[in-house]
Structure formats: structure tokens, C-alpha cells
A protein has these predicted regions:
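DPxDG-like acidic metal-binding loop motif
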Residues: 1
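Phosphate/pyrophosphate- and phosphate-bearing ligand-binding catalytic cores of soluble enzymes
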Residues: 4-109, 113-116, 121-133
């Protein structure tokens, strides 16, 4: 880091789901290139085609090695399951949806229910995609 607390991208080795800076970011500055990459746009559209739109917590769990969290959650019968206004998406079971006014308690209940049922059925411990503080 510089004397002003700045860290350059070249000094950070980001990887898929890994940031060596185990901390929170309060500010970032990005340099953007002008233009449009149609290949990246198509890849993004394909990736999002099976994901729900609207208010979403996003992916709940990381995919376990050699499997998919969404497949496991669906296999235990929780795809589309709701508690209050929180719902495990009926489009992709690893997405948590806020139907209107979901509470933290309802969302957390669904996260723990999915983790418990998947472990009971498959012996797989699902790891959170996000950190709950």
C-alpha cells in the first residue's frame, strides 16, 4: 500500500471467489476502457439466462467440488420453497428471492434449512457464498 493507503491492482492476486485482502472496501477507483465486447456480453447473457430477475440475495452457497449447490437444493425438494416473503427461487434453487418484504430471519431460516437438508441427504456441507455479519 502507498502512504495514502492505495493498493494497485498489480499488487493484488484476485482469483475466482478469492480476495487476498481479507477486509472491507470503502472506496475503489476503476479505469474503464471504451468499447463493447460482444463475446463477454453473450457469455454474461448465457450465464444469467437461468438466474432469476428482480430482488435477489444472489447465490447463497458456493458450489461444492464436482457438484452444484442449486442441484443439491432442488434434489432435497426446496426449489421454490418460501418462508414469509423469502423464497428459494423456482428458477434456480441456489438463489434467495425477496418477494416483497423478506425479513433477515426468514432468509436466514431458508439458508440454514437448505444447508441442513443437503447435509442430511448427501453429506455435503454447503459453504456460504456471502459472509453474513
Amino acid at each position: 500500500a502507498t502512504s495514502q493507503g492505495e493498493i494497485l491492482r498489480a499488487n493484488i492476486n484476485f482469483d475466482y471467489r478469492f480476495c487476498p485482502l481479507n477486509t472491507h472496501f470503502f472506496w475503489a477507483e476503476f479505469k474503464l476502457n471504451f468499447g463493447f465486447d460482444t463475446l463477454k456480453d453473450e457469455a454474461l447473457k448465457n450465464a444469467r439466462s437461468n438466474q432469476p430477475s428482480g430482488a435477489s440475495f444472489g447465490s447463497i452457497f458456493k458450489n461444492p467440488k464436482n457438484d452444484f449447490a442449486g442441484r443439491l437444493i432442488e434434489a432435497v425438494g426446496l426449489k421454490g420453497f418460501s418462508k414469509g416473503d423469502a423464497m428459494l427461487s423456482d428458477k434456480h434453487a441456489n438463489f434467495l428471492i425477496n418477494k416483497k418484504n423478506a425479513s433477515f430471519e426468514d432468509a436466514f431460516f431458508l439458508i440454514e434449512l437448505a444447508r441442513k437438508k443437503v447435509f442430511e441427504e448427501f453429506g455435503t456441507n454447503l459453504e456460504n457464498e456471502v459472509i453474513i455479519i
